[in-house]
Swiss-Prot record:
Disordered, as annotated region: 484-508
Taxonomic lineage of the native organism: Bacteria, Pseudomonadati, Pseudomonadota, Alphaproteobacteria, Rickettsiales
Assigned keywords, A-Z: ATP-binding, Chaperone, Cytoplasm, Nucleotide-binding, Stress response
Protein name per Swiss-Prot or TrEMBL: Chaperone protein HtpG
Region (B): 329-558
Similarity comment: Belongs to the heat shock protein 90 family.
Organism: Anaplasma marginale (strain St. Maries)
Length: 638
């Protein structure tokens, strides 16, 4: 060794080194990722420069990265045969934080962006992550076209030395790390393999590990299939890659592969699974799309490159323009991530919409697996256009559904009756109970279709989404007489008028009795109801519950109470079908005999029945049973 020169790091480097070692990175594994990325950059540079200067390397020579360990000396070495660095470049690039050679190289060639020249070290701090695990760092390098090599050495204490390497040296760079005593496990073969396959599996150059017997073992696949043209990727390649990143044994239901070359460049290779992943409804709602920068894995945990309501997606997003902060773990420009996220979201929704139109049978399987997750997006803050894009791919059961048929909101609107102003819907626990609900009887009997919502998330989005394509949503629990009057089957204006006149006459004859009985019911039920009225939407059922126009939907209110987010019970309206034989009998009983214990019990039974139908708890199950028993005993006593 000769010509040793000791130098100090540039100003404030001591503080920055401390930041890098103690604060910037949360995962020590990334030091090896950073060193390998630098080696890959060096190979990229040489490959690019070789196009104009073929004396820099032998034609056909393999550019490679080699990892070796010396357990006795606690040394981990990473060597590449890339472009290498001169003495001045060692000082400039390794002696100054945030002044990386890669950034300088890009600036020199910014006049013509080279195809295939992928350089990720855009900030000069990645290298310094080695001091998290090493007490001493040596970098030996010989630049392509030169015959003299140089050695850079530092313990991360604010100074470094540079010297000339005596004797013959080969082109490239060798990084030698003397590991701390408590970081010995980074010399373990399996630990190295895990880090390489996790972060650098798709680096475009082979990464070898020299085994204990001196043989070389290739660690990375070196293939990033998302960088290939989509028509050159076989179905078997897709299946193999999907299974490797998703840990799902089945084949993907759909592949979404695009290369975006607009303002921000990125590639997305996304898969929709054909089965529901086990962690789909994990409380963390984790997304499983991996973020890469030029084929180097960055994260899948702390950056949301897809919205959470698309967390069923598996795959990768790889960007060459993605800005990085000083650390590759913390992305610098959230706005760029948001742009990628918005673009990917649009592409996914477009692909789903096309699939729903072209293959509705297959799409039903997708919807049954992931529809509830996708509808979570409707609850998020977004503009109307984005929300309607989600609604356009949503599918629903309806009162007209046959054998589980699903419809779109577009289908519903196209079938609306003349004069219909709302998309009517009903929330229920399941399809069967919703189809049999008294709430929709009047709508169905008048030919009005009702959307049936049976997922828990439906109660949330219907409270924030007010309309679709200009048509407002309305719960059938808020439907009143005016919503049904104009849809009576077979009515024209004249017959409607005549029927109304006859109805008024009939009502006048029994109005006093009906109003008196309703007043009596209000007295019996007290604060349990806010109102009792004659229903127009009931045709076969006896009673149902309704809510005022602007009140919470019954199912939503119940959920909030269960979650302790609501301490009160909202007002209920009890609706009566006075054409029902039971009500007719009660009206006669009240008219003939007035108030009685039997009538009082029956009034409570009617209200409890309405609560049970809506899934509400009765005030007292014991009282309900006792009243029913008294009514039955009275019946059989006769």
């Amino acid at each position: 060794m000769g010509d040793v020169e000791e130098l100090k790091f540039s100003a404030e480097v001591g503080k920055v080194l401390s930041l890098v070692v103690h604060s910037l990175y949360t995962n020590k594994d990334i030091f090896l990722r950073e060193v390998i990325s630098n080696a890959s950059d060096a190979c990229d540079k040489l490959r690019y420069l070789f196009c104009s200067d073929q004396s820099l390397m032998e034609a056909g020579e393999e550019l490679r990265i080699v990892i070796s360990v010396d357990r006795d000396r606690r040394e981990l070495t990473v060597r590449d045969n890339g472009i290498g660095m001169s003495r001045k470049e060692l000082i400039d690039n390794l002696g100054t934080i945030a002044s990386s050679g890669t950034q300088r190289f890009l600036e020199e060639f910014k006049g013509g962006k080279a195809q295939g020249c992928d350089l990720i070290g855009k900030f000069g701090v990645g290298f310094y992550s080695v001091f998290m695990v090493a007490t001493d760092v040596v970098v030996e390098s010989c630049k392509a076209g030169e015959k003299v090599g140089h050695r850079w050495q530092s313990s991360g204490d604010g100074v470094f030395s540079v010297s000339t390497i005596e004797g013959d040296v080969s082109r490239g760079t060798k990084v030698i790390l003397t590991l701390r005593e408590d970081e010995f496990d980074f010399l373990d073969k399996f630990r190295i393999e895990h880090i390489v396959t996790t972060y650098s599996d798709h680096v475009g150059y082979p990464i070898y590990l020299i085994a204990s017997d001196g043989t070389e073992e290739k660690l990375n696949s070196g293939v990033a299939i998302w960088t290939k043209p989509k028509d050159e990727i076989s179905e078997s390649e897709h299946m193999e890659f999907f299974r490797s990143i998703s840990h799902i044994g089945s084949n993907p239901w759909m592949v979404i592969h695009n290369k975006n070359e607009g303002t921000i460049e990125y590639i997305n290779l996304l898969y929709v699974p054909s089965v529901k992943p086990f962690d789909l409804f994990h409380p963390d709602r984790r997304c499983s799309v991996k973020l890469y920068v030029n084929r180097v894995f960055i994260t899948e945990d702390n950056v949301q490159v897809i919205p959470q309501y698309m967390r069923f997606l598996r795959g990768v997003i790889d960007s060459s323009d993605l800005p990085l902060n000083i650390s590759r773990e913390t992305l610098q420009n959230n706005m760029v991530i948001e742009k990628i996220k918005a673009s990917v979201t649009r592409r996914v929704l477009t692909s789903l919409r096309e699939k729903a139109d072209s293959d509705p049978v297959s799409y039903k399987t997708f919807w049954e697996n992931f529809g509830p997750v996708l509808k979570e997006g409707l609850c998020e803050a977004m503009d109307t256009e984005s929300r309607e894009s989600i609604l356009s791919v949503c599918r629903f059961y309806s009162s007209n559904s046959k054998e589980g048929e699903l419809i779109s909101l577009g289908d519903y609107i196209s079938r609306m009756k003349p004069g219909q102003e709302h998309i009517f819907y009903l929330s229920g626990n399941d399809l069967e109970s919703a189809m049999r609900s008294p709430q929709i009887e009047g709508m169905v009997s008048n030919g009005i279709e009702v959307v049936l919502l049976v997922d828990p998330v439906d109660d949330f989005w219907t409270s924030v989404v007010l309309e679709y394509k200009g048509v407002p949503f309305k719960s059938v629990t808020r439907v009143d007489e005016s919503d049904l009057e104009k849809f009576t089957e077979g009515d024209d204006q004249q017959s409607t008028k005549k029927k109304k006149e006859k109805k008024d006459t009939d009502d006048a004859q029994q109005k006093e009795n009906v109003e008196a009985f309703i007043d009596y019911m209000k007295k019996v039920l007290g604060d349990s109801v806010s109102d009792i009225k004659v229903s127009r939407k009931l045709t076969t059922s006896l009673v149902c519950l309704a809510v005022p126009e602007h009140a919470l939907d019954i199912r939503m209110e119940r959920f909030l109470r269960e979650q302790k987010q609501l301490s009160y019970k909202g007002s209920r309206i009890l609706e009566l079908n006075i054409k029902h034989p039971v009500l007719s009998g009660l009206l006669r009983e009240y008219k003939d005999n007035g108030e009685s214990e039997l009538l009082e019990n029956m009034v409570h039974v009617l209200f409890d029945q309405a609560c049970i139908i809506e899934g509400e708890e009765v005030n007292s199950a014991v009282d309900f049973a006792n009243r029913m028993n008294q009514v039955l005993a009275r019946l059989f006593k006769k």
